[in-house]
Amino acid sequence: LYEKEKAEAGLFMNEVALNKVVLACEEFAAYDDISEHLLYASFQERLLAFCEEYHTLSEEECRAYLEKNTTILEQELLPAYLALAENLTLLSPLCNKDYSGLCSYESGKEYYLALIKRNTGSYRSIQNIKEMLFADFEASYLNLISLVSTYPQLTETDCLYEFDNVFPLTDAEDILEQLKSSMIANFPPLLASPNVEVKKVSESLKDYCAPAFYLTVPMDDYEDNVIYLNDANSLEGLELYTTLAHEGFPGHLYQTVYFHNQNDTSVRNYNALLRNTLYFGGYTEGYALYVESLSYDYAISLCSDAGVTDARIICETLKNEWKMQISLYCLLDIAIHYDGATYEQVKTLLNKFGILEEESTEAIYQYLLEEPTTYLKYYLGYLEIENLKQISKGVWAEDYSDLAFHTFLLKTGPCNFKRLEDELLEGE
């Protein structure tokens, strides 16, 4: 009904997006043997693990739950996906034909600005946001040019790709332990060390999951934490290291546990519980990207101690490439949805940065079209935290330290960046 109302109002998705959704629904609902479907396999795996650990259900009860799940899948859930695909297909004549951004709709610019504020927690003007992104992109670009000019070996084809083969750590648990050691001096300690388990994504879920993710804990149980790695994506070396920094320490896992337990003594931390009901994506993802950036420096120390040749210049090169790519996508997001950039204009710009394949440029444009502000949530959030860091250096002067700033950021907890800046200045 919702998509039908959107279509009738002229706000329906474009044909490429529709075809992707319909295909995803059809593939999700398809099965030869229900026992091989991901929702059957995942439910069975978790139910059997529960029964084995807690012994609260009899074999007969477990079997009854499995049968009930099968009935729901076969008779209700999967047919609903097929019905959704069929009904969406009927709306295809109402697809958006011009493949343009939000600004092409009535009040689209205003909606996009509201979306930025909501998803990033930044209250800056669009012009100020552009200036921040341009300045950061230029700084990364100049750093990259300087590195390549000073160290011509970076232009050798295999130099950067072979770095993963000599990276000192390969095991996820070992990397998390090393990250915990690296962050000690600059981050406040947790009241209690949480249980952390690294799991592989179930075979049945590999095609539907991100390369890695932290499974956010229930609000009443933050002691047992899980990070999932997806074997379908070949994360290794530096990429695995920085990803685990983002998801684990000092990233999402650490930030979540710290905020939950900082006030937990004899009473519940109602502040943290309330924040669980609110959305502060710019803070949480911006913070995770901020510590991911820091982890490149941790990697330099790790590799240098292990005697890896050219560790510093390779890590710095990869870090600047990574930052350039995300800031470029943020600028394109604004160009498409606020300034009205067309596919041809976006393609021309991407070509200048070496992205030449039509399939790649189309995929980037389509993703930005379908997911406005997603990259901004991460990167503008990151830039806002870097800005707060600079403000704190001016406010605290000789009392500044990275530890003090990180403690302030983590204790204040998830909120918008205007509130964070006000808190910082009020504590002057």
State what each model feature region is.
Residues 1-428:
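N-terminal maturation segment of proteins
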